[in-house]
Curated annotation (Swiss-Prot):
Family (UniProt): Belongs to the bacterial ribosomal protein bL34 family.
Segments for region (Disordered): 1-50
Organism: Myxococcus xanthus (strain DK1622)
Keyword Ribonucleoprotein among record annotations: yes
The protein's name: Large ribosomal subunit protein bL34
Cited Pfam families: Ribosomal_L34
Alphabetized GO MF terms: structural constituent of ribosome
Length: 50
């Protein structure tokens, strides 16, 4: 039996899929642009503010 592959970590999730990571590349900025155009409430996955 192999272990589950999803081992959640807020830090790792934000580093991989956060706003700064998206903004760092042309493709990522395109993603943000599309999500803004679509009217997404949340542009990126990120830990909710406390």
């Amino acid at each position: 039996m192999s272990k589950r592959t999803y081992q959640p970590s807020k830090v790792r999730r934000n580093r991989a899929h956060g706003f700064r990571k998206r903004n760092a590349t042309k493709g990522g900025r395109d993603v943000l642009k599309r999500r803004r155009a679509k009217g997404r409430k949340r542009l990126v996955v990120s830990a909710p503010k406390k």
